[in-house]
Amino acid sequence: CTNYECYKGIYSSFNSMNMFEIAHSLNRQYGTEQWCIYRGKHLMTFVDNHDVSRLATILTNKNHIPLAYGLLFGMPGIPCIYYGSEWGEEGAKAPDNDYALRPCFEEPKPNELTELIREMIAVRRASDALCNGSYRNVVLTNHQLIFERRTDSDRMLVAINASDSEYTADHHELQGSFEKVLSYPCAAEAGKSSCDSAAETAADTSASEDGSADTPETAAGAVTETVTIQGQIVMPPYSAQYFHQV
């Protein structure tokens, strides 16, 4: 079953700068209340496919492309990438045909977005919370969203800032020791971005589909740093961050 409600919610939330839309859909589907309709289910999730305009075309602000993937790999479901979109390929659906959506590529065109998506895949595969955990909104504004994914043994916070300004999120539940296992934009370290370093390790990461084989720090060790959160998370402009509680 494909999750078209959240597909629409992702791009529409960024285009309208209203994160309440996707947060409402995710809570309606996967929240902790008994009435939530897909609790414990694994729908296929996506930001584009062979029937709709590509993400890079439909988003009005291209800075939001990496953040949309940050949402995709942080939210419940089974994330699916449409071929070519991993490097930001564009393509608009026409009224009478889908030719622009289904080009024939002579060769791949990997770029920084491709490497970031590889890192997100590695982090997700290594996290039981991201693969199987519950969903709960923690901080929600028009431009920012922090949500929690949790199992009995694992907890992850996903923080998205769609604004062009830094934002400090305040909440009493933002407490404890965490490993920052994903950080976009990447911080430059020793002449190499942390995303570049993580991409090199991600290719060697193995994990079972249920997320039980590895830990987030082995999947993206190059970007892992331990931070103590005391009621606040600083969210850089146009950022996606994953925090794994230790």
Positions of predicted regions on the chain:
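Carbohydrate-interacting/catalytic domains
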Residues: 20, 62, 76, 81, ...
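Conserved alpha/beta catalytic core and glycan-binding cleft of carbohydrate-active enzymes
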Residues: 1-94, 141-142, 148-151, 158, ...
